[in-house]
Amino acid sequence: MKNSSKYACPMSDITINQHYVWQHYLRAWTNSKKLWCKRVDNPEPFNTSPRNIGAQRFFYEFQQLSWGDITYLKALISRASSPRLRELNQGWIDSAQMSFEVRRKLNSIDIKPQHREELEKDLRKIEKTLGESLHGATEELAIPILAKLREEDAAFYQNVETRNDFINFISHQYFRTAKMRNIITAIRNPLPHDIARTWPIEAFIYATNLASSLVGEGRKRRIIFLRNASAVPFITGDQPVINLLGANEEEVDLYYPLKSDLAIIFTANQLSFPSDHIDIGAIEVESYNHRIYAMSDSQIYGDDPAYLKVLAKLPKENLF
């Protein structure tokens, strides 16, 4: 498992529209570089580029933490029994607060106004873009892995390094989203903190905790390929990785659609999934699609607008 805080962050440009659903991933549903999106606030699906969806303005921006925020995050980190895991998670806090510490030290130094202004611009770039760049570093490692998965090839999982890259990637894809932020926001916590300030760091902490647990299970886990043998396409959404056992469960069977005719389940459940390749029909595809829809925050995506429109009319409660 890698702590992506070691990766350099290019600061030549500021990315305003920051994606919590990977654009490269969504391209599998595109035709002529566009896919269909059904938003909760729009009655009709619309055809658009992946760059225009699954994103919010400065979604990953780091802010200066208050004493209460730090106390809350340290309490969260302290739950881990592993000293190494606590160290990794402390690294996320340190990385997120690095620019504010630099700014504090600069305030006590006599610097020419024009140089101070340039330094301030650089620090603001770091605060606004470092989070997305860290996620981008994880995704970069996953590009060849995703390509293999879409070929129904999981041989990479037998190699420790690429197995851990996959686990790290899917853990971050699970926790990095607006939906997971909103779920955590709804949970009451006795420690006073501002979720707007803590969440961009919490997402890394939760993902690191999950990845550590999954790495520990090693070869007990398998990648199950679900082949869509029906005319009903797999969809995806703005929460593209879901836990089939429930969002509030500690145990996870992670479902991840890869394209309209292929999805995977990452599981340790040999009894429920005895085969690594399973052909499924329309009813099962509908069930998985409804789960993606039910866990979506505000958007679902696919290559069939009529199907998305019909699906979005259903209640989000479990129908299967």
Predicted regions and their residues:
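Alpha-helical structural context detector biased toward long hydrophobic helices
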Residues: 2-17, 21-320
